[in-house]
Design a protein with these regions (language model features):
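Secretory targeting and sorting signals
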Residues: 1-28, 717-731
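Contiguous beta-strand segments within globular domains
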Residues: 48-86, 133, 611-620
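Catalytic grooves of carbohydrate-active enzymes
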Residues: 245-251, 353-365, 376-602, 683-685
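Active-site beta->alpha N-cap acidic-glycine motif
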Residues: 171-173, 177-318
């Protein structure tokens, strides 16, 4: 039961037009993989529906008034269904967000309301029905709602298939039922009421999937795989709506936008111009001969100019007007996975680069030092304080948010997230309920949390991958409660930062299994590539005449690794498999790019056999560098016992150039030929370990003086033999002539 579009959500007064029904192919792509790893941690309650029942729109709900609800029916099966009927039911009002989650997962819904007939549907057919749901006690088929509050509603779709009765689908939603609009509700101004109000703060994340083509290096133009981001930056696009929604609501200073610095960086580069292409040309290509370039199609393979530069620039202008900013990890990377990769530069880019990026692009400083990871938990200590769930344990410094409210808010949007800090018994495929229903639920959950009596402070953290419909619903409800004095605004900058808190077993992190956690093999691959990137950087040398630095050149390669560790769609049941696949593909392409860059620094063998005129004759070999910066490398070798090479401590190869390296050799005199293997390695300290291999090893054979003498001796003997044979034949001919 899904709605394929995003509709405005203002409390429950949401009116939008349903988009066309999705194609069977689209449904197939969104369907969870039945063989999903750790399926028991994703699906704890509610099974899949046979058909789809999706909330399209609903009128604002008030006590004693009817609610008009429009739903769409989609027959996604391969057979016809008949005698369809949609019925409305409700459960008791919920007092806590935990109760709300329990009702949505496995509620009783014991109060029955009206039904409406929906006829028959052939395979692939869709239909909309409108249901008037009375709430007054005296009405017929009423849900009998007499008090304001948050109520769980259930819409069921039943009918027959091949003459057999069946239940085909359900749609569950939490709605905010307001009081009678004719009765004025004064704001809570008394001292006693003020003491009962929650201090409220809201964290509003903004991020997106970044499809920068892997293998990017410093100094290169931006290449994107698609125009997906351009569409989100355009007026009415997802990112444009998110910023507009934040700016158009007054949260009385209680809200703060948690922005992904990687998104800002890509938007800034898009504004300067970019290209759309599924691949990128190698920057380490060796020069080609003219005739080799005649039939090259490389110029035709460079892609098309991007069309979203102006929209990206306009979006950044809006971002510069945001009143409060804080940070997400770079590319919304999983902070625990970054820590387990155990690379200092990678951790720096994930958590410490963001503030400088905001300052450089937006011209402002971040208002809060807090960073909000998508996981909502941390098992590692970082240099910056994190925002974590209040039911988790952590090391380092952190502030906490309401975990139950956070789990309920995370269920909203086109990519509903299964967060690791949520109770597995209350998990299910949240996308079984439509986006519109979950947007309404998100808004109502703020009202529920605001009315809870068991807590005084309230921090609402929206999901890191936020959609406009849910954002509008939450912001409308929040502003209504703040305007009415039912919440006390507290700036995010005023949130208390707490020191390490360990759990009963001493293990920090999530209290429950996280189904989206990165596997050890994935982290090991990232760690390996991060190390290779460090090694590549270590051989390059900054050149005063070249603006590009070695760190700047390798920086995009590290950022590729952070994109591969992104939680943006990985934490969603229906996005996990595709996210894991995209991560593997990015790591493979990044590995290919690293291999290409490393192989551009190479040794060129002098031929199969290198002949020395004398023992003091030097060996000459050419070292080539295809990188845009000079390279300092160590010439390493492997030789048989008794053979040694005297090489330079460091070989300096100019940028995009080559150099001839001279070395002397002390080779065994009793051997005709000596085989040597040479390669370039990372620089080493005098007493340090051997450097890591950079170039592919080459094999050369050195012919010694003894070998030369041996060859000459064989040649002389052969020449004498030929001369004697010729003299012998000549003598025989003379004898024959004399006898003739």
């Amino acid at each position: 039961m899904r709605l394929r579009g995003l509709c405005a959500a203002a409390t429950l007064a949401l009116f939008c037009v349903a988009p066309a029904a999705p194609s069977p192919q689209a449904r197939a792509q969104d369907t969870p993989d039945p063989a999903l790893e750790n399926a028991q941690y994703w699906l704890g309650a509610r099974g899949p529906d046979e058909l789809e029942l999706s909330l399209v729109r609903a009128s604002e709900a008030h006590v004693g008034q009817s609610v008009s609800v429009t739903l769409r029916l989609d027959n996604t099966s391969e057979s016809a269904v008949d005698n369809l009927q949609v019925t409305a039911r409700r459960g008791d009002a919920v007092d806590t967000t935990t109760q709300a989650r329990q009702q949505l997962a496995a509620g009783a819904y014991q109060y029955y309301g009206p039904s409406v007939s929906a006829g028959s549907l052939e395979p692939g057919e869709s239909r909309e029905v409108t249901l008037e749901v009375p709430t007054a006690l005296g009405d017929e088929s009423t849900l009998a709602i007499t008090d304001p509050g948050a109520y769980p509603l259930l819409f069921t779709l039943t009918g027959t298939r091949d003459g057999e009765a069946a239940s085909f689908a359900e749609e569950r939603v939490l709605i905010d039922v307001l009081g009678d609009p004719a009765q004025h509700e004064p704001a809570a101004d008394s001292d006693s009421e003020a003491e009962e109000r929650h201090q409220f703060s809201l964290i509003y994340p903004v991020t997106a999937q970044l499809d920068v083509v892997p293998g990017d290096t410093g100094g290169q133009d931006l290449i994107l795989e698609s125009e997906n981001l351009a569409g989100q930056f355009a007026p009415g696009g997802r990112l444009d709506q998110l910023v507009e929604t934040y700016l158009s609501h007054d949260l009385h200073g209680s809200g703060c936008m948690a922005v992904d610095p990687a998104l800002l960086d890509v938007a800034d580069r898009m504004a300067a111009g970019y290209t759309v292409n599924p691949s990128r040309p190698s920057i380490a290509q060796r020069p080609k001969r003219l005739r080799d370039s005649w039939f090259s199609a490389s110029e035709q393979d460079r892609g098309d100019p991007g069309t979203g530069s102006a929209d990206a620039a306009a979006w950044l202008d809006k971002m510069r007007t945001v009143d409060c900013t804080m940070l997400l990890p770079w590319a919304n990377a999983n902070t625990d996975a970054v820590a387990e990769a155990n690379n200092a530069w990678l951790t720096h880019e994930a958590l410490e680069r963001g503030a400088d990026t905001v300052s450089r692009i937006l011209g402002t400083t971040v208002n809060s030092e807090l960073t909000a990871p998508a996981s909502g938990t941390t098992a590692h200590e970082f240099s910056v304080p994190l925002v974590v769930a209040d039911n988790s344990t952590w090391v380092g410094n952190a502030t906490t948010f309401d975990s139950s409210l956070g789990a309920l808010l995370a269920e909203s949007g086109s990519m509903p997230q299964t967060v690791g800090y949520s109770n597995p018994e209350l998990r299910y495929d949240f996308a079984e309920d439509s986006e519109q229903a979950r947007a309404l639920t998100a808004g109502a959950s703020i009202s529920v949390a605001a009315a809870q009596e068991d807590q005084k402070d309230m921090v609402a953290k929206l999901p890191n991958y936020l959609d406009p419909a849910a954002a509008r619903s939450v912001m409308e409800t929040t502003q209504r409660l703040l305007d009415a004095g039912q919440l006390d605004p507290r700036p995010v900058t005023a949130l208390p930062i707490k020191s390490a808190q360990e759990g009963p077993d001493g293990e920090p992190g999530s209290p429950y299994p996280d189904p989206a956690a990165f596997r050890e093999a994935e982290i090991a691959q990232v760690a390996q590539q991060a190390r290779y990137t460090d090694e590549l950087m270590s051989i390059m040398v900054n050149e005063p005449s070249i603006a590009l630095t070695r760190y700047g050149f390798t920086l995009p390669l590290r950022r590729d690794l952070l994109i591969a560790l992104s939680d943006t769609t990985r934490t969603s049941l229906r996005g996990n498999a595709q996210a894991a696949r995209a991560s593997r593909e990015r790591l493979q392409k990044n590995s290919d790019a690293l291999r290409d860059l490393r192989s551009s620094v190479s040794l060129i063998p002098p031929g199969n056999v290198y002949t020395r005129v004398s023992e003091s004759s030097p060996l000459l070999i050419v070292a080539e560098n295809g990188l845009p910066l000079p390279v300092d490398a160590h010439l390493a070798y492997d030789a048989p016992d008794g053979a040694t090479l005297s090489t330079q401590d460091s070989v300096h190869i100019p940028a995009k150039g080559s150099i001839t390296v001279s070395m002397t050799a002390d080779l065994p005199s009793d051997m005709d030929r000596t085989s040597l293997r040479l390669w370039l390695a990372t620089p080493t300290e005098s007493d340090g370990p051997a450097g890591h291999l950079i170039s592919e090893p080459i094999d050369i054979t050195v012919q010694t003086r003894a070998g030369i003498v041996s060859v000459y001796g064989v040649g002389i003997v052969a020449a004498l033999a030929l001369a004697l044979a010729a003299l012998f034949r000549l003598g025989r001919r003379k004898k024959k002539k004399s006898h003739g």
